[in-house]
Amino acid sequence: MSSHSSPADTPSARKPVTLHTLREMHARGEKIAMITAYDASFAALVDTAGVDCILVGDSLGMVLKGQSSTLSVTMEQIGYHTRSTSRGTKAAFLIADMPFGSYQENPVQALRNAGTLMAAGAQMVKLEGGGWTPETVNFLVERGVPVCAHLGLTPQSVHALGGYRIQGKDEAGAATLRRHAKALADAGAAMMVLELMPSRVAREVQADNPGLMTIGIGAGAGTAGQVLVLHDMLGVTRGRLPRFVRNFMDSATSIEDAVRRYVAAVKDGSFPDETLHAY
């Protein structure tokens, strides 16, 4: 059995979202709505629903492969899903995760693997961690690779962090996050995912780096935008979900409608609700 149409043929009424577009949105205070997708069909759907950014996340290891962490995801797998997602994306800005082991060795390794993902259709790559990463970020940015950093709960470091725990709860931890964020912004990171940290800390990171586009997930409403895993916000993921997840399918008539509701809630500031989805 075959389909008579391809997601790549889906028309788009929107102009393509570029890094310049996102910076203009941030400058005028418009929130950025990001969501994960891993294939052409869902990419076309969320693109049509109006998301600004699509993240081909290494979360695919958990939501697609059924694994307990993201650590076993490979460059080959991210590349495959980036190519597939790119084919269904007409307007949204496409970001690809750099999987564990693809950038930690040295900046040259990072550039080689980032180049592979850009060739697969990514317009930006995302890498995790503070500390040692600014050198790598700067190396990539100077060579034309836009970078999204990732601080707070960094899933690739789950064992070093002792599990999926809130980061920056005490002042020492908060100060470390602020310091790492400043170093990454100074190194040229255009965007930064802030995951599982107190709202206060995320607000401070954004205030300290006004030109940086911070994207929250479990970091409160004070960031420049929000991201959720598609399967989480559709209620597909089984088991106990993190507090910061909201099921947008509850009142939706279709998956596309659920994603539209998510985009609207991010844009109007009703998601996340600080009393329900923040720490």
From Swiss-Prot:
Top-level lineage group: Bacteria
Cofactor(s) this protein requires: Mg(2+)
Regions crossing the membrane: none
Query: Where mainly found?
Result: cytoplasm
The listed locations are:
Cytoplasm
According to its UniProt record, the EC number is 2.1.2.11
Q: Which GO terms describe its biological process?
A: pantothenate biosynthetic process
> Which residues make up the binding site for Mg(2+)?
58, 97, 128
Role according to the record = Catalyzes the reversible reaction in which hydroxymethyl group from 5,10-methylenetetrahydrofolate is transferred onto alpha-ketoisovalerate to form ketopantoate.
Query: What protein am I looking at?
Result: 3-methyl-2-oxobutanoate hydroxymethyltransferase 2
Species source reads Methylibium petroleiphilum (strain ATCC BAA-1232 / LMG 22953 / PM1)
Lineage at the top is:
Bacteria, Pseudomonadati, Pseudomonadota, Betaproteobacteria, Burkholderiales
